[in-house]
Amino acid sequence: MAFRLSSAVLLAALVAAPAYAAPTTTTKVDIAAFDPDKDGTIDLKEALAAGSAAFDKLDPDKDGTLDAKELKGRVSEADLKKLDPDNDGTLDKKEYLAAVEAQFKAANPDNDGTIDARELASPAGSALVNLIR
């Protein structure tokens, strides 16, 4: 129950404020970078795989968490607090991937399970790119 509530709060926070950081310029190249099956769209599985790889890249001390310094440019300190259900000041991989999933859903307003170039160019899509690049 607590996980569902925290997931609902997380999703609400993400949908209410779709951009964590300054939007990036998004092009078809961005899709190709996260689209290993080359179908021209990003599905949730691909977004989570890219998010997992991004998390690993962002965690140079390999402590399994990302703090505000490691998240700089991807998640503001204010948004870190919203995304941190255990309030320890860091995001572990599970918390980070929950943010990726929620942002994927925010960037997919037609709920077709994939993000195309138009959706990726939206503010919510740009915020997703910030998390998975």
UniProtKB/Swiss-Prot annotation:
Has been used for metal extraction from two distinct rare-earth elements (REEs)-containing industrial feedstocks covering a broad range of REE and non-REE concentrations, namely, precombustion coal (lignite) and electronic waste leachates. After only a single all-aqueous step, quantitative and selective recovery of the REEs from all non-REEs initially present (Li, Na, Mg, Ca, Sr, Al, Si, Mn, Fe, Co, Ni, Cu, Zn, and U) was achieved, demonstrating the universal selectivity of LanM for REEs against non-REEs and its potential application even for industrial low-grade sources. It is found in: Periplasm. This is Lanmodulin. SUPFAM superfamilies: EF-hand. Nd(3+) 3 binds at D84, D86, D88, T90, E95. Monomer. Nd(3+) 1 binds at D35, D37, D39, T41, E46. One of its GO terms (cellular component) is periplasmic space. Residues 35-46, 59-70, 84-95, 108-119 form the EF-hand domain. Nd(3+) 2 binds at D59, D61, D63, T65, E70. REE-LanM complexes are remarkably resilient under acidic conditions, retaining REE binding down to pH 2.5. REE-LanM complexes are stable over a broad temperature range (up to 95 degrees Celsius). The gene is lanM. One of its GO terms (molecular function) is calcium ion binding. Lanthanides are essential cofactors in some pyrroloquinoline quinone (PQQ)-dependent alcohol dehydrogenase enzymes in the methylotrophic bacterium M.extorquens. Pfam families: EF-hand_5. Gene3D superfamilies: EF-hand (1.10.238.10). Its main location: periplasm. It comes from the Bacteria. Keywords: Metal-binding, Periplasm, Repeat, Signal. Residues 1-21 form the signal peptide. It comes from Methylorubrum extorquens (strain ATCC 14718 / DSM 1338 / JCM 2805 / NCIMB 9133 / AM1) (Methylobacterium extorquens). High-affinity lanthanide (Ln)-binding protein. Shows 100 million-fold selectivity for La(3+) over Ca(2+). Binds 3 equiv of Ln(3+) with picomolar affinity and a fourth with approximately micromolar affinity. May be involved in receiving and then transporting lanthanides (such as La(3+), Nd(3+) and Sm(3+)) to a specific periplasmic destination. Nd(3+) 4 binds at N108, D110, D112, T114, E119. The keyword Signal applies.
